[in-house]
Regions:
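Non-heme Fe(II)/2-oxoglutarate
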Residues: 1-77, 95
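A short coil-to-beta-strand element that immediately follows conserved catalytic motifs
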Residues: 75-85
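Generic internal hydrophobic packing segments that stabilize the cores of diverse globular domains
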Residues: 60-68, 83-87, 105
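Catalytic core of non-heme Fe(II) oxygenases with the double-stranded beta-helix
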Residues: 84-108
């Protein structure tokens, strides 16, 4: 295993009840009115900061907290920041050009 300063660089986290969470989150996303942006069929990336995003509340409460705890334990750290959450729903022929975001170190 590759390490950096004795910290293993690989980390695997299986979300408990992932399929159930996925279905709930997809249903919550579908409550957001259709919002095409560039060549993406549906997203909230361009909606106002104060726009109600029920899926983020669900994600933070039911997935993120447990993930964060395990990830920080793995790193031997006590703090990490989450700056933003958004979704992008792609249909056939949708696309988004390659790009990077400052302060983003992983996505899924």
């Amino acid at each position: 295993m590759i390490t950096l300063n004795n910290i293993p660089l690989s980390f695997l986290y299986d979300v408990p009840k992932a399929v159930d969470h996925k279905n709930i989150i997809l249903n919550l996303i579908q409550k957001i009115p259709p919002n095409k942006y560039n060549a993406i069929s549906h997203t909230d990336v361009n909606l106002p900061e104060g726009f109600h995003r029920e899926y983020t509340i669900y994600f933070l409460k039911n997935i993120y907290q447990q993930f964060k705890q395990k990830f920080l334990e793995h790193l031997g750290e006590t703090h990490m920041d989450l700056h933003n959450i958004w979704f992008q729903w792609y249909n056939q022929n949708d696309y988004h050009p390659w790009h990077v975001h400052p302060w983003c170190h992983f996505t899924n």
